[in-house]
Amino acid sequence: MKHLKNYLFALGCLAAAGLTSCLSDSDSDENTGISRQEISQCLAATKGNYTGKIMFEVENSNDSNDHIDTLDIAWSVTTDTMVVINQFPQAAFLENIKDSTMKAALAAAEPAESKIMINFYQASPIVFLLYPFPIIYDIEYKGEPHKASLVFWYNTYYSFGQFDTSSRVFQMQLIMAALFLDEDTNRNYLLNSGSNTASLPIMITNANLSKNQ
């Protein structure tokens, strides 16, 4: 899998084009934004259960041009305008943790639930912004129980998705920002860098990826 950037570029172009639309609270034709009725129609079209792939960047010692790995993943869109991923895999970010003790603790932990709020802002094609909540992992770190929180960028058009009503292809991009231990937000375990934030993209899709290889 070598073409994550191609996917992200295509999605980014669509998101940028849709930013001219704004949410509105009225059904008036004079509004340039998406109406409540259109939001309901978008939700009705997208809700349901999905299976596909999560795509994320990794190092590949065998091929310097191939930095993408994939895992199977399942998610659902609920009636309360949420994306729910019951088991978000730690493998999507483990390679970016340089603290070996933290990496081992997360590798041994159970996958955790991810909840992401959807904000529809374009009806045709269906495009939406994503507001992911932190994913909380129960871990044992240095012999003690802790909670590790995976935090994402939100309120940005880099966290978004699209849905094709004819093919039912669902695609979304999220940007991982930080991994914190308990309430300590002064140390970001992602990348183990001096910066307190990272920008690590992942993509989730049920598209046929073999067509893009």
What is each residue range found by the language model?
Residues M1-N6, G12-T46, S210-Q213:
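Bacterial Sec-dependent N-terminal signal peptides
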Residues I34-Q213:
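First exposed extracellular module after export/assembly in secreted or surface-exposed proteins
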